[in-house]
Amino acid sequence: MQDHLVNETKNIVEVGIDSSIEESYLAYSMSVIIGRALPDARDGLKPVHRRILYAMHELGLTSKVAYKKSARIVGDVIGKYHPHGDTAVYDALVRMAQDFSMRLELVDGQGNFGSIDGDNAAAMRYTEARMTKASEEILRDIDKDTIDFVPNYDDTLKEPDILPSRLPNLLVNGANGIAVGMATSIPPHRIDEIIDALAHVLGNPNAELDKILEFVKGPDFPTGGIIYGKAGIVEAYKTGRGRVKVRAKVHVEKTKNKEIIVLGEMPFQTNKAKLVEQISDLAREKQIEGISEVRDESDREGIRVVIELKRDAMSEIVLNHLYKLTTMETTFSIILLAIYNKEPKIFTLLELLRLFLNHRKTIIIRRTIFELEKAKARAHILEGYLIALDNIDEIVRLIKTSPSPEAAKNALIERFSLSEIQSKAILEMRLQRLTGLERDKIKEEYQNLLELIDDLNGILKSEDRLNEVVKTELLEVKEQFSSPRRTEIQESYESIDTEDLIANEPMVVSMSYKGYVKRVDLKAYERQNRGGKGKLSGSTYEDDFIENFFVANTHDILLFITNKGQLYHLKVYKIPEASRIAMGKAIVNLISLAPNEKIMATLSTKDFSDERSLAFFTKNGVVKRTNLSEFGGNRSYSGIRAIVLDEGDELVGAKVVDKNAKHLLIASYLGMFIKFPLEDVREIGRTTRGVMGIRLNENDFVVGAVVISDDSNKLLSVSENGLGKQTLAEAYREQSRGGKGVIGMKLTQKTGNLVSVISVDDENLNLMILTASAKMIRVSIKDIRETGRNASGVKLINTADKVVYVNSCPKEEEPENLETSSVQNLFE
């Protein structure tokens, strides 16, 4: 027993695990690349597709015979040629039968073969299939020694290594596949254009791509649609890689009082049902405004998805949002990767055209040799027949006097110098061939064979003659399968600028404590006299109230800065417009806020100019300034870091600082104000902390800040019980940054603590005051008395509610005077 174990141990070879894994993975990779995922550059088929078509050919399932069960076909494929799962084989067969997947179907399916809505095909035991005329052309001449056959997986049968493919299947139907470390994505094309290009290359071997582009306009998807921009097409055809934008084809129908958008053609590989659901969700969530209903009216006549618009909706704006937010516009990546000589390679369009032509030449040469040998063999026999017919009496005598067939055969060979094949054919010839009519047929057949042999020899000897045959067969295929172009191609990509379609009007943007945001036309709010009761500005959920509002133009950029120091930006028009009493939309649907992250400041700006900066203020008195240009870019949804906060601190506000600014003023909850030079806070990067702006007493914290450009600037302070006053900036003496400040407003039990301080240089502005119960009142600022810094102010609103925010806004009569500088910032 021990000796046996020793002998077994001697047969063990130790190898490094890294080298073993490397070799095994390489073998697996090549197996996937060559044997599964990528098509051959010549016939455009992956192994599974080639085996399916060959199995159908062996079953005799031509386009003119009765259908056979798909299960029978799949069984033959996996049993004889493709030792993989039946589901994978059936899925491949199903795809070849789908008119929305293939530009030229290779399988004629009967039964449920799936739909563009993503519905699965029926089980293979229910469906039936046969070949189409297109797949017959791919297999044509396979029995004429045109291709090589290789052993199948168990070496019991032979299968084709490649198919003759009389039609350029790779470019006509395209291909998609993901291998190991590489992928292919070849779009389908119109067969007429591809064959015209092939004919041109055949006659002009040195043809340039520019000339080919006169024939091949671009991809032609089975689902139609519109390709925008030719640059991506040219790049793909030139280098083998490119990208094109594909849009659904739509038209707008007008009814009595509204419009409907009708979608008639889909981008390639788009699931219609999911698209309809996607549009419905976006409309329901108000991410796309103006849609009242979406319904699918598609039937056997074709696709028809109806998007019904609201009465006041503009179809151009809705379409622009649909293209940006849904799969009504997709990007198709073109990768012309295929297998040639057992190796994967990225080809240019010209290389693929030349490869197919070379393949067809090889097929035709092999077929010609096969037919030539067959014709020569037949002519040889006919020559024997003619000798026999000329000497029929003597031949009959020789046969009659011969003791055996073998002796008769030898006698004929010796007497008339015949070959063994000829003498055998004469002995097997029927007596009816001796009639005069049959003699003439033999002579005619022989003469025709001589002409055929001469013609076949001409093909083999002349390159021009060979090219002529290739071209003739290509034109026959074109005539048989010609079809109109389905995909429209626009010269350039045009995206409608939504801003150009939206009027630049002042809006009141409000946000609730729980983060519901909306915008309302400024005209919806009426001006009232000082001391008025106010008007309800919006309904809220229970335990929620409007805590933040501001005025901005629809084209302005809103900067949202959160308590965690994160900054987000969004165009005003992207905030859903609502009625004055509506609750609005959750801000988390517009920007990506983290848990417990709350917006503390919202600013309005026209652009991200480097001539301005942002000043940030924290609850514990830290101030920081960063150039505005550092916050531009496309990270509007995920946000960008604006300030680094100390532990336990949080951001309470921010300000836009322009070149005219001279001082910063910070105000605290207990009424302390500090004014210091702007130069004391130099500009620093985004991911920094800042410096101390005000030193706070116990239980005190920052509630607001103002940027001062001149000592004549007026500041308006408002307490939580609704008292307010105007004070000149010069009333607050300049101090060094980091001090405790001076009393800015006399606070008593009647006034309550300080809520906010804002700049109000324009007396023609109105003051908007917001209470915790969502009441809002507009008061003319010129009606608010100017007092000293140590005064308490006058009553601005008669209500038992606590004031939570205040802001200035343009008067309703002069909305055109709205400027970025008039839009103030709000702080808690």
Curated annotation (Swiss-Prot):
GO CC annotation terms, alphabetical: chromosome; cytoplasm; DNA topoisomerase type II (double strand cut, ATP-hydrolyzing) complex
The Topo IIA-type catalytic domain, residue ranges: 38-501
Localization per Swiss-Prot or TrEMBL: Cytoplasm
Molecular function in Gene Ontology: ATP binding; DNA binding; DNA negative supercoiling activity
Highest taxon above the source species: Bacteria
UniProt main location, coarse: cytoplasm
Annotated CDD domains: TOP4c
PROSITE patterns, alphabetized: TOPO_IIA (PS52040)
Keywords for this protein: ATP-binding, Cytoplasm, DNA-binding, Isomerase, Nucleotide-binding, Topoisomerase
InterPro entries (alphabetical): GyrA (IPR005743), GyrA/parC_rep (IPR006691), Gyrase/topoIV_suA_C (IPR035516), Topo_IIA-like_dom_sf (IPR013760), Topo_IIA_A/C_ab (IPR013758), Topo_IIA_A_a_sf (IPR013757), Topo_IIA_dom_A (IPR002205), Type_II_DNA_Topoisomerases (IPR050220)
Catalytic activity annotation: ATP-dependent breakage, passage and rejoining of double-stranded DNA
EC nos: 5.6.2.2
Cited SMART domains: TOP4c
Gene Ontology BP terms: DNA topological change; DNA-templated DNA replication
Active-site residues, as the UniProt record annotates them: Y126
Motif (GyrA-box): 528-534
One Pfam family cited in the UniProt record for this chain: DNA_gyraseA_C
Stated role: A type II topoisomerase that negatively supercoils closed circular double-stranded (ds) DNA in an ATP-dependent manner to modulate DNA topology and maintain chromosomes in an underwound state. Negative supercoiling favors strand separation, and DNA replication, transcription, recombination and repair, all of which involve strand separation. Also able to catalyze the interconversion of other topological isomers of dsDNA rings, including catenanes and knotted rings. Type II topoisomerases break and join 2 DNA strands simultaneously in an ATP-dependent manner.
Misc. comment: Few gyrases are as efficient as E.coli at forming negative supercoils. Not all organisms have 2 type II topoisomerases; in organisms with a single type II topoisomerase this enzyme also has to decatenate newly replicated chromosomes.
Family: Belongs to the type II topoisomerase GyrA/ParC subunit family.
PANTHER family: DNA GYRASE SUBUNIT A, CHLOROPLASTIC_MITOCHONDRIAL, DNA GYRASE/TOPOISOMERASE SUBUNIT A
Subunit details: Heterotetramer, composed of two GyrA and two GyrB chains. In the heterotetramer, GyrA contains the active site tyrosine that forms a transient covalent intermediate with DNA, while GyrB binds cofactors and catalyzes ATP hydrolysis.
Name of this chain's protein: DNA gyrase subunit A
Species name: Helicobacter pylori (strain J99 / ATCC 700824) (Campylobacter pylori J99)
Lineage, broadest ranks: Bacteria, Pseudomonadati, Campylobacterota, Epsilonproteobacteria, Campylobacterales
